[in-house]
Amino acid sequence: MINGSIVALITPMNSDGSVDFASLERLVEFHIDQGTDAIVAVGTTGESATLPMSEHVTVVSQTVKFAAGRVPVIGGNGANATSEAVELTKSLSKVGVAAMLGVTPYYNKPTPKGLIAHYKAVAASTDIPQILYNVPGRTAVDMLPETVAELVSVSNIIGVKEATGDLSRVKRLRELCGDDFLLYSGDDATAREFLLLGGNGVISVANNIVPQAFKAMCDAALAGNAELALSIDTPLRGLYSTLFCEANPIPVKWAAHRMGLIECGHIRLPLTELSEQCHGLLIEAMTRAQIEVK
């Protein structure tokens, strides 16, 4: 079972836009050293939308290589064309990922029937465990708990990342999907409550820059220690909101660069680097979270 503190890893890039694999290796080592429980490679935070498929597979493959079995790597396999998602899934099945994370098809707004057919087709193309991913704020489609429940019977669909921030869904998903179905928060601001309500883990943006504290918060919440989880979480709360002052992963990449975790904060168009008016806000939030800014 993959649970606990899972980082939605950024994809570091050089100033010319190419992937910076040296920085990627350092990031993987950093997270292993800090106790991160698993790594998601090339999800939303990893700029999946602007990496061509061949490059996408290479980044996931290299992440697996750098992790060297010390921490599970989950590969992003979402696409808005089912045929493309199937092709990507088949390629990722060959590189050693522990699981895959598939966002709902975006822009074309499938019905529940379409979502079910999409995920069944993707799951049928591999034996690797599949995690569904619902983030309607980015995809324009909301996969309701009732739709998720229709997919529980697919043997290699093992869980869902729920990123709406609607905590009522934790109880509803658990009721409909059973105790063995894995529930992951995709919203840092409500992650602590999500875990205390019975979630299994958090796939986090903030974890990129505060992995040790975030891991401690997750461990406390999973152990049912609400008071300790709150005390760890409180200094991080400003960070959770400020990391979304512009579209993810713009702020977190800038922050990682300021910390010296990556050599360059470059991000691919149509996203651009963090606006100057956000710099002070993010530095203030990082300082409150006891992050050293270089």
UniProtKB/Swiss-Prot annotation:
Its main location: cytoplasm. GO terms for biological process: diaminopimelate biosynthetic process; lysine biosynthetic process via diaminopimelate. One of its GO terms (cellular component) is cytosol. Keywords: Amino-acid biosynthesis, Cytoplasm, Diaminopimelate biosynthesis, Lyase, Lysine biosynthesis, Schiff base. It holds the Pfam family DHDPS. It catalyses: L-aspartate 4-semialdehyde + pyruvate = (2S,4S)-4-hydroxy-2,3,4,5-tetrahydrodipicolinate + H2O + H(+). It is found in: Cytoplasm. Coiled coil: none annotated. GO terms for molecular function: 4-hydroxy-tetrahydrodipicolinate synthase activity. Its EC number is 4.3.3.7. Pyruvate binds at T45, I203. The record marks T44, Y107 as: Part of a proton relay during catalysis. The keyword Cell inner membrane does not apply. It comes from the Bacteria. The active site is at Y133 (proton donor/acceptor), K161 (schiff-base intermediate with substrate). Homotetramer; dimer of dimers. Belongs to the DapA family. Catalyzes the condensation of (S)-aspartate-beta-semialdehyde [(S)-ASA] and pyruvate to 4-hydroxy-tetrahydrodipicolinate (HTPA). This is 4-hydroxy-tetrahydrodipicolinate synthase. The lineage of its organism: Bacteria, Pseudomonadati, Pseudomonadota, Gammaproteobacteria, Alteromonadales. The gene is dapA.
